[in-house]
């Protein structure tokens, strides 16, 4: 299928990427495979993953700690954008792909590899995200995609890998396909392919069930500066620690579970389960602090920008000119997004309790109040309403009686 002396493979340790190593060597004639795994805070023993790649036949196996750039450069922009694909999915998995792809391209250049490879199948979104990101960063770099070309079933893939000494990672007791990073978990396949079947509790790992969550509500306060969360309960934290703390707080109370039918890029509807407690909590609070610091017209415009931003990221266009332009709009709005939000966590719910901004609040009590301290000029409303309704009255005077 080609003559590639050296290839850098995006490696996860799963069935597909593990099978890619012997497949690339035997079917593509690749001489050297450098396996690259990204540490995105998934909490797995990545040394095991690294050694597994070597066992499968990789000449070199690398693990890079990308947690800090993942949160600072990808998660925080998503929070500022209130990014929810189809109004529900906070892009916890999608945000990781352009970062992995960019590091893949860097390694290919550093090691003078002739191509890069990934193990994404032809049915999923990740193939699109990887291919678009790689081609945007290195248009002439060859991308090898064996999982789109082989015709093996999942069981055949496992058997294929076992022939080369690769142990099967999926048992009958764990039929799910899972992706995990610091922002959350995505779970699909197995029994979840029946969209009417409730997910078993075993599906969830980082959020408590309603039954097991605390019986007492917990109120917390999250502080924002320029649209970024910077402190929880008065304690200033770095971006990675903010996510970890938010995950622990929201997850303990069972907040952040999502069960949805999702429209994939390739046109397939898919049943997806997500756990993203910290990210969902921070987005909810960020939306609230925006409500008091941004003007009505900016808020209305930003809602449309947010939807388009989430669509672009989901569809693989992280490095597109349009996404960059939307970033510029969002980042400008965030200069005024400063303040704190109080929120109560209890039995799977997160309920806003209050919000304040000392420096940028557009909520003015002297204007909003109905008390004796009201400073709003009520008489001015008459002239405003006359002009505001002028077009309607003109239309009615001409057409109403026809």
From Swiss-Prot:
GO terms for cellular component: cytoplasm. ATP binds at residues 10-18, 38, 119. GO terms for biological process: argininosuccinate metabolic process; L-arginine biosynthetic process; urea cycle. InterPro entries: Arginosuc_syn_C (IPR048268), Arginosuc_syn_N (IPR048267), Arginosuc_synth (IPR001518), Arginosuc_synth_CS (IPR018223), Arginosuc_synth_type_1_subfam (IPR023434), AS_cat/multimer_dom_body (IPR024074), Rossmann-like_a/b/a_fold (IPR014729). Keywords: Amino-acid biosynthesis, Arginine biosynthesis, ATP-binding, Cytoplasm, Ligase, Nucleotide-binding. CDD domains: ASS. L-citrulline binds at residues 89, 125, 129, 177, 186, 262, 274. It is an enzyme of class 6 (ligase). L-aspartate binds at residues 121, 125-126. It is found in: Cytoplasm. Pfam families: Arginosuc_syn_C (PF20979), Arginosuc_synth (PF00764). It catalyses: L-citrulline + L-aspartate + ATP = 2-(N(omega)-L-arginino)succinate + AMP + diphosphate + H(+). PANTHER family: ARGININOSUCCINATE SYNTHASE. Belongs to the argininosuccinate synthase family. Type 1 subfamily. Homotetramer. This is Argininosuccinate synthase. It comes from Prochlorococcus marinus (strain SARG / CCMP1375 / SS120).
């Amino acid at each position: 299928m080609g003559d590639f002396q050296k290839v850098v493979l995006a490696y996860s340790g799963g069935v597909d990427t593990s099978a890619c190593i012997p497949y690339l060597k035997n079917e593509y004639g690749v001489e050297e495979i450098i396996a690259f795994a990204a540490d995105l805070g998934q909490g797995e023993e990545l040394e095991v993953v690294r050694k597994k790649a070597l066992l499968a036949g990789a000449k070199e196996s690398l693990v890079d700690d990308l947690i800090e750039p993942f949160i600072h450069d990808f998660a925080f922009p998503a929070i500022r954008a209130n990014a929810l694909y189809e109004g529900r999915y906070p892009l916890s998995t999608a945000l990781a792909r352009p970062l992995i792809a960019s590091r893949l391209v860097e390694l290919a250049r550093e090691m003078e590899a002739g191509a890069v490879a990934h193990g994404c199948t032809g049915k999923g979104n990740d193939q699109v995200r990887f291919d678009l990101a790689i081609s945007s960063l290195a248009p002439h770099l060859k991308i090898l995609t064996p999982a789109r070309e082989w015709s093996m079933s999942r069981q055949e893939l496992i058997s294929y890998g076992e022939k080369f000494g690769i142990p099967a990672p999926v048992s009958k007791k764990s039929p799910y396909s899972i992706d995990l990073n610091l922002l959350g978990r995505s779970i699909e396949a197995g029994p979840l392919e029946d969209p009417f079947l409730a997910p078993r509790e075993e599906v969830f790992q980082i959020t408590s069930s309603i039954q097991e969550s605390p019986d007492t509500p917990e109120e917390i306060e999250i502080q924002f500066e320029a649209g970024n969360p910077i402190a929880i309960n008065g304690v200033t934290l770095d971006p990675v620690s903010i996510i970890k703390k938010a995950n622990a707080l929201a997850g303990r109370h069972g907040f952040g579970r999502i069960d949805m039918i999702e429209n994939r890029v390739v046109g397939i509807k898919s049943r997806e389960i997500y756990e993203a407690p910290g990210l969902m909590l921070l987005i909810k609070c960020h939306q609230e602090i925006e409500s008091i610091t941004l003007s009505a017209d900016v808020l209305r415009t930003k809602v449309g920008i947010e939807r388009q931003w989430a669509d672009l990221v989901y569809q693989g266009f992280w490095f597109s000119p349009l996404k960059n332009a939307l970033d510029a709009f969002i980042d400008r709005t965030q200069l005024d997004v400063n303040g704190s939000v109080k929120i109560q966590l209890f039995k799977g719910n997160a309920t806003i309790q209050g919000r304040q901004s000392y420096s940028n609040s557009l909520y003015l009590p002297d204007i909003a109040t109905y008390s004796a301290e009201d400073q709003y000029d009520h008489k001015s409303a008459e002239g405003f309403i006359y002009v505001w309704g002028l077009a309607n009255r003109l239309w009615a005077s001409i057409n109403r009686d026809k």
